[in-house]
């Protein structure tokens, strides 16, 4: 009976083709979502940096006058 148990365990550990495809698709979707989040964060940070730079320039300009 032990060899049958071993076969069952091997079957459970080895994902089927459909499972692998689902896993790969899920990983690709996760990667795309993370990439979109990174781009969105980068955009926000760039805008903030630009605002801070403009404020700094105004401050420097008012000090020199």
UniProtKB/Swiss-Prot annotation:
GO molecular function terms noted in the UniProt entry: microtubule binding
Subcellular location per the Swiss-Prot or TrEMBL entry: Cytoplasm; Secreted; Cytoplasm, Cytoskeleton
GO cellular component: apical part of cell; cytoplasm; cytoskeleton; extracellular region
Single GO biological process annotation from the record: axon development
Start and end residues of each stretch annotated as Disordered: 1-30
SS bond list: none
Coiled coil: 31-51
Keywords attached to this entry: Coiled coil, Cytoplasm, Cytoskeleton, Secreted
Function in brief: Enhances the tyrosine carboxypeptidase activity of vash1 and vash2, thereby promoting the removal of the C-terminal tyrosine residue of alpha-tubulin. Also required to enhance the solubility and secretion of vash1 and vash2. May play a role in axon and excitatory synapse formation.
Family to which this protein belongs: Belongs to the SVBP family.
Protein name as catalogued: Small vasohibin-binding protein
Organism, scientific name: Danio rerio
Organism phylogeny: Eukaryota, Metazoa, Chordata, Craniata, Vertebrata
């Amino acid at each position: 009976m032990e060899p049958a148990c071993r076969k069952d365990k091997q079957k459970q550990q080895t994902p089927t083709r459909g499972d692998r495809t689902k896993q790969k698709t899920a990983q690709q979707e996760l990667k795309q979502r993370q990439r979109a989040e990174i781009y969105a964060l980068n955009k926000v940070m760039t805008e903030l940096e630009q605002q801070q730079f403009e404020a700094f320039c105004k401050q420097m300009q008012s000090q020199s006058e």
